[in-house]
Amino acid sequence: MDSVFKLEPFEDNYEVGEDLGSGHFAVVRKCIHRKTRQAFAAKFIRKRRGGGRKGAKMEDIVKEINVLRCMNHPNVISLHEVYDTKQEVILVLELVSGGELFDYISEKEALSEEEASAFIKQILEGLKHLHDNSIVHLDLKPENIMLLDRTSTKIKLIDFGLARKINDKDDVRAMMGTAEFIAPEVVSFEPLSLATDMWSVGVITYILLSGSSPFLGETLQETYHNITALNFDFDHDLFQNTSDLAKDFIKRLFIKNPRKRGSVNDCLNHPWIKPSEPREAIARRSAMINIDNFKSFMARKRWKQSMRVVSLCNRLTKSIQLRKSTDTLSSRNTLSSRNNLDEETTEEVNCGAWSPSSLGSPGHDPALDSLVVEQEQQDVQKLRHMHDAEHHDGDISATLATPPSFLHPPD
């Protein structure tokens, strides 16, 4: 193991606090260094053991660590140190506690293009640091653009789980990222490059200005088709207050050929980001983003996330109940013990926290069960955070009967 991986018990040096979030095979918790009292975010990544399918591959964990070690920029999250245990690798990261940029903007009553372009500039400056180090992020989206703290407008790029070093000689082809933000070359399984990130910047900018996602379809296939066909426009109702400079900035990123797409340096020197004439600065200052539609976009996004999680909880609960019936018919000798186990499991699912190992039953692949649960658990975690944010008492089990106010459909 790399000598920079610390092997002593993590708790010897840190006090572990509340959960900050969860993802695939990982959970992030706030921690306090015992001596310095400095706060960090600790990312606990479960290691894949042997031939199992639960946990992250060690090579992927090391890849993420190596990328983070190259990072040293005000707009990119920094890695403090790494611990290795038998079950987990723990990344001690800079604490970023200001929430998502888009959530911050949705709380404002108005936002000029001048302010919007300042946020995009910070994203570009962080991205330039990556690209100068030949690193492509591959998962740029609003959820991975955070504010340092609640009193700051400093942006931090986070989540380098898909990031990798890349150069012109590499022929990297991979289907990765979040559908509505991925570039045409990802959909077509063509070589990826630094330009792949730039397409995502275009999507983020489009949404920020209009409150609408340019390529999102009713289905995944429709979204992919819209991306590869460049099926987007600047709808008058959405962009009537948008400057031509901003539209030009986006159009230079929505180019199918990656070699012709605007680079991070091109974008930083674009007049929408860096005005060279007074009229360009005035155009930015007088134009406004579509804040009403942006608020509606964020409300719809939260609604869809919430309803998806409620649906997943219901499906998982029904699945467990069905397995209980199957177990009863297949083995009356173990009826009592299995019923106790399943009742505990069902209770945990309703609370949004469950153990994948407790879902096994005859005729099912436990490894496959755990993969499904790992993917769905992060959605449940998001729902719990939103539930807390709305100041509702109780747990997720209540939403299965009567959805709280934040689950009411947006207008």
Model-found features: residue ranges?
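Glycine-rich ATP phosphate-binding loop
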Residues: V27-R49
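C-terminal regulatory tails of eukaryotic serine/threonine kinases
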Residues: N265-N350, W354
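Conserved short submotifs of the Hanks-type protein kinase catalytic core
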Residues: Q87-E100
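Conserved N-lobe beta3->alphaC-helix segment of eukaryotic protein kinase catalytic domains
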Residues: F44-M71
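A short, aromatic-enriched beta-strand patch in the conserved N-lobe beta-sheet
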Residues: E81-V82
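Activation segment signature within eukaryotic-like protein kinase domains
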Residues: F119-I120
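Protein kinase glycine-rich loop
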Residues: V16-H24, V28
